[in-house]
Amino acid sequence: MVLSSELLTSILDEVRPLLGQGKVADYIPALAQVPADRLGIAVCTVEGELFTAGDASEPFSIQSISKALSLTLALTLYQEEEIWARVGKEPSGQPFNSLVQLEFEQGIPRNPFINAGALVVSDLLETRLTAPRQRTLELVRRLSGNPAIMADQVVARSEYQHSARNAAIAYLMKAYGNFENEVDKVLQSYFNACAIRMSCVDLARAFIYLANRGVPLGATTPLLPARTTKQVNALLATCGLYDEAGDFAYRVGMPGKSGVGGGIIALIPGELCVCVWSPELNKAGNSLAGTAALELLAERLGRSIF
């Protein structure tokens, strides 16, 4: 089937009956206020063609999708072995905010897409940058072509006020010598990245570099080397959907990254990047209707990385 906005509209119509069966993230009070019936999808091709349906232009809180962007920024600042000495490359099989595995593995997080791993990446950014929050915003604005993108400070404050578990994770890593900076400062930068508001259109454009051998949309020089891009995609395929990464690979067959704001980005290297948004989550913390929409898209296009 040929990619078109009509195809995307038909996919959203097909998954719309799932609305009401999931649950909006309510442990972050500011996120609990997002209307549960929102549903949008955008696909950007490596040539820059854009196809959209539903609420594709409405900004939302990207949450853990930011972890892929933070890792990308870190990879532009550090030798890769400096990063992988402090965070692993393995799926966790545990909830994204688990302390148990971190204690067992002596403060080395399993991967950069669970909270502990993302906090290590934020710590690395804090060490190397004088203004990590601003640099992260500059990166997403440049990648998406949208200079108006901002972080929602109400959401960032809300997350910071409910950050005891993330603080515990950071202090545990500090106890094992795997955290360099002041915990409070790193947490604020971490939550600021999670609170960035982007639309499906923004995100589909922003992540094209991962589908295009490291080259961002409209650019000629790579942000990341092709080899590094391949490695990031491998991590997204194995670790990007919390402890549901295997099921997502089985059903959708694309590298992806989700966030509890209800967004999921996924990509087919050499072809396209897609972002879907529906705030209601399943038990693993991934968008319920969003996952179903991506499964249908992969099926209709007959595309998968496997």
From Swiss-Prot:
The keyword Hydrolase applies. Keywords: Hydrolase. GO terms for biological process: glutamate biosynthetic process; glutamine catabolic process. It catalyses: L-glutamine + H2O = L-glutamate + NH4(+). The keyword Hydrolase applies. Its EC number is 3.5.1.2. Substrate binds at S64, N115, E159, N166, Y190, Y242, V260. HAMAP family: Glutaminase. Belongs to the glutaminase family. Homotetramer. This is Glutaminase. It comes from Aeromonas hydrophila subsp. hydrophila (strain ATCC 7966 / DSM 30187 / BCRC 13018 / CCUG 14551 / JCM 1027 / KCTC 2358 / NCIMB 9240 / NCTC 8049). The gene is glsA.
